[in-house]
Amino acid sequence: MKQAREVALDALTACERQGAWSDGYLKKAIGGAKLDGRDAALATRLCFGVLQNRMLLDFYLSKLCATPLHKLEASIRNLLRLGAYQLLYLNRVPDHAAVSEAVSLARKKAKNPRAAGLVNGVLRSLIRQREAMEPPADLSTRYSHPQWLVDSFVARLGREEAEALLAADNGEPPTCAQVNTLKISAEELAAMLTAEGVAVEPHPWLPDCLFLNGTGSLEHLEAFQKGYFYIQDAAAHLAVLAAAPQPGWRVLDACAAPGGKSFAAAIAMENRGSVTSCDIHPHKLRLIEA
């Protein structure tokens, strides 16, 4: 049975090799591995943490690895990123255990029999040198954002405010739930989720939205199974608030996957009218249909 780190590794490798959508692949992999709530949360944190900081992780790893990262097997490249993220950002697992787990995965995943030794050497070097390693000077690498976006932020905001924005953008986002007010009120849902052991807070400026913590696997929550809420980032929900669709409207969601904005529009329209959901990527259309 796969554990959290292997699930995260498989998701990262699929994203790189196949262009898989990280959230959709990870959810499927977590379900297939039957991870409990704690391990599902760890796999999610590891996968998204690596994706969010990949340029910075590669910057550090490239200084420690004699072989250029792009010449490594995809699974080993992502395993190094995974191990580096764990050593630099997480402190729940002792360093020696993190390295040991990475080496075990390398033996299982790599085609090259020497890969396990490489993983062991690079990660142990990172442990020895991490306190002395200087962060990169350029903001793009330090915050793992594309250069064109950093240049745009700096031009508009100045370097200091742009850096603060980049740092905030790399913060761990809260889990934001959009309440399906066609079925339940925000207050009723909050009480139901609290009874299921979820920590709930009202969103400070979005109506009918809740911050959730300690959900474990959402599919196990009765409120989720009954369609009382779905997860949607606040920024995506703002698009629907700005459009302010009314009952009876015909709405076109031209960039719809995975479907959250279309759902929010249907709720705002009180299920009266029509919503046409489109996306240019066929694999994302399947997410909407699901």
Predicted features by range, described:
Residues M1-A290:
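S-adenosylmethionine
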